[in-house]
Amino acid sequence: ITLQKNVLFSGTVRENLKWGNSLADDETIWKACRAACADEFLSRMPDGLDTMLEQGGNNLSGGQKQRLCIARALLGNAKILIFDDSTSAVDTATEKKIRKALADYKDVTKIIIAQRITSVMNTDQIVILDDGKIHRVGTHKELLANDPIYQEIYASQMKGGNDNGSEE
């Protein structure tokens, strides 16, 4: 599970990522980092995977922490991954890259809990909750055509924006 606010420990980036898979070699770690777009900032750090993290990852931004936690989850080789608003601190362009990379993990079931419609638009199924209960289940296209709650959320989030969530 990857949460909106995850835990990072004092130690190196490598040590933190190996909590996901203690046997992972650097090649495997970098592959997970690329999928989570963590390579984008790690490659600019002088010590890369050996960069020391403060307790809680306080020397990283919120988005950087989230990307490391996504990479750590990917290293676990789980059959089911739960992403609970795990890209909320990531800009939309980076989130789009992460979504595209996660699509390559075809044998992994991904449950995405999100507030941004762009996070779920291209998923197989979207479950709309209302007052803690399942309101409707469908694809983006089905819900946009038939569900007033989804239509309202979509309209409010897409107003003024041009991110259609597509995987160009």
PLM-predicted stretches and their roles:
Residues 6-24, 60, 119-120:
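Conserved catalytic motifs of ABC-family nucleotide-binding domains
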Residues 14-55, 99-100, 107, 167:
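ABC ATPase nucleotide-binding domain helical subdomain, centered on the C-loop/LSGGQ "ABC signature"
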Residues 81-84:
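Catalytic Walker B motif of ABC-type/P-loop ATPase nucleotide-binding domains
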Residues 2, 39-68, 86, 90-93, ...:
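ABC-fold ATPase nucleotide-binding domain signature/coupling loops
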Residues 102-114, 120:
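Conserved catalytic loops of ABC-family nucleotide-binding domains
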Residues 44-48, 100, 121-168:
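C-terminal portion of ABC ATPase nucleotide-binding domains
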Residues 75-79:
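A short, proline-enriched helix->beta-strand linker immediately N-terminal to the Walker B motif
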Residues 61-62, 68-73, 97, 112:
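ABC ATPase nucleotide-binding domain "signature" region
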